Amino acid sequence: MFAVTVEFTLDLAQRHAFMPLMLENAARSREDEPGCRQFDVCTDATRPDRVFLYELYDDAAAFDAHLAAPHFRAFAAATATMVVGRVLERWERVAP
């Protein structure tokens, strides 16, 4: 399995606009992408400007397909000005 973590730092004034778009992107990823096995969206009340994602895919090609999916491209375009920072890391899962 191929794991991806993403930590977004948001423009705090845009958080309420960002979250519904993020949740829709996560749902569409799980429902529409056969290679997406898990897509968790996490927040921390002590850091309201942060959103953390944990995603599992069958392999790197499935993640590449996610990045090319129309729903992801629409999400990325719609949220571009809401995000002030993003750290994406790719991992190989070795145990559940």
Where are each of the predicted segments found?
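Short amphipathic alpha-helical segments
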Residues: 14-37
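Absolute protein N-terminus
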Residues: 1-2, 96
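Short, well-ordered beta-strand segments in beta-rich or mixed alpha/beta enzyme
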Residues: 2-9, 38-67
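Generic structural signal for individual residues within well-ordered alpha-helical segments
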Residues: 16-19, 64, 73
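Short, flexible helix/strand-to-coil boundary loops that buttress conserved ligand/catalytic motifs
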Residues: 22, 66-67, 76-79
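Hydrophobic alpha-helical segments typical of transmembrane helices
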Residues: 25, 52, 71-75
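Glycine-rich beta-strand-turn "strand-cap" elements at beta-sheet edges
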Residues: 40-49, 74-96
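Generic structural signal for secondary-structure transition and capping sites
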Residues: 27, 34, 62, 72, ...
